[in-house]
Amino acid sequence: MQPVHAHREPAVHYRVAAPSPHNHLFTVGLDIARPAARQRLSLPVWIPGSYLVREFSQHLQGLRASQDGQPVALKQTTKNTWVAEADPKRPLHLDYEVYAFDPSVRTAFLDRDRGFFNGTSLCLRVHGQEDRPHALDLDAGGLPRGWSVATGLTPAEVDARGCGRYRAQDYDELVDCPVELGPFWSGSFEACGVPHRFVVGGAPAAFDGQRLLDDARRICETQIRFWHGDGPPPFSHYVFMLWATGEGYGGLEHRNSTALICQRQDLPLKPGQAKAKPAALKATDGYTTLLGLISHEYFHAWNVKRLRPAEFARVDYDQENYTGLLWFFEGFTSYYDDLFLRRAGLIDDATYLQLLMRNLNQVLQTPGRHLQSVAQASFDAWIKYYRVGENTPNATVSYYSKGALVALSLDLSLRRDGCATLDDVMRELWTRSGGGPIKEADVARALKRLGRRDFAAELAAWVHGTDDLPAVALLKAQGVKAEPEKAPLAQQLGLRMADNGSALVIKTVLRGGAGEAAGLAAGDEWLGVETPARRGTPAQAWRLRKLDELPALLGPQRRFTALVARDRRLLRCAVQLPDDEVTAFKLSPGNSDTLRPWLAP
């Protein structure tokens, strides 16, 4: 029988270095204390939270194995799997490199200014030892001078910069804790007694870090109290890793951290700067969008990282992991992200309703909502959501956007009935599952138990059906003013446009719209318009550079000819604007007595 401390020693040990960042290569050393005779190793094909097979092994190169300095036979058996013929009585060592030049939050990146990696991109999985302790070394000597380390991993022995050894209880924890490297800005705060760190790379000199910390703290405290009241969250510390860049936006959730990307211009600036964010945030402010992203990824620490689909009880890193519940885990998170900005006091009722309006109109202007249910969209995420094409809006619906409307509709239905709220349902699911895997039946049971009636009809229609949700009627009943208004011109035309500055290009032709009836196609370059002769007005032809020029050129006319270029041919397409204008909705505060319990409980 071994002493207890022996079980704490890492069975699998990685050493990651970046000796030459300009070549975008991380070097990795891997030591396995007790390998199998035919030790299998593999690199994941996907990263949890991003539902697409990304083939991370395409960037792994120079893999070699040895024992006591002598080469060991290594055979590749699949696209992402290798077998080493090892002596089980001796440690097995492997060396390899990983090319890292993807600036997204999903993979790995390395240049002279910054390093970042997810374990799914760098750390080979040692089959048979996934549940044993793992260690990761980030030695100061293997990193550029002046770089620091930020990660959610537990430090075992590190210096002031964070360089040194980190531990994970198993492979799942190791790859669920990304690592940020570089000369980043770093700040910290406590939320409900729990330490939080916020690091930001790529920020300008006028960046107002203190405002970001204060606003993030309010979001975190509001969410912790939402789930636990005065109790602690399910993590002992949390790390935000934000990279500010010229272009880009996104985030990926992890068990006690998140990796985020925003545009540099969206960061708050210190007071007195020309473009400093005003104290009162608007729905159109980039900083409001950033705070919504922070709120979204933080909420995921509960909803998807712990409370998760039953199919994700144990992750299979070698293939797709299907679930029909992303409408709940991503959609409900999308409902709560902006709502928590309101409840934290960062935005007012009017601003929140403008954010909600944007999501509502986006769904209403997506023809695919009548073809694909949100449950099917969840299951199809692996082949559709991340593979956007010109027909995507016609054939699919977003489980983020429509899932958020499902959450809204359920919440307002519960509030109308007067027995419970969706907040109560979320906490009920957390308590009864122990913060673990759930099925759709668990959601239905919680709704029935707390709502004191069966919600099977709503789930069948809203989740598994393709009819529009009663969101507008429910909003009106809750005290929201919902007024129809004219949709944007492109939507009236049944088009989505891409304006690259020098050409006006059709990106998507929406099903059933005026553009489809006219014979316009995705990829057409819209050059100009011809208007027919009218009494006292001759026929005219105009160059069209921006779509918003069209109303002035048409005047009261509803019919015109679009001049487009397609495959080096010039075509005329007769367009008839619809008599019944496509509508959107404008939301604004109405009855504060009924709004207050929902928006600011």
For every predicted segment, state its role:
Residues F56-R64, D131-A150, T154, C163-D172, ...:
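Zn2+-dependent metallopeptidase catalytic core
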Residues A18-P19, G49-L110, V126:
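A surface-exposed beta-strand-loop module
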Residues W185-L326:
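Juxtacatalytic substrate-recognition/specificity segment
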Residues Q2-W46:
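Early extracytoplasmic/domain-onset interaction patches
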Residues D95-L181:
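Extended, low-hydrophobicity, Ser/Thr/Pro/Gly-biased non-transmembrane segments
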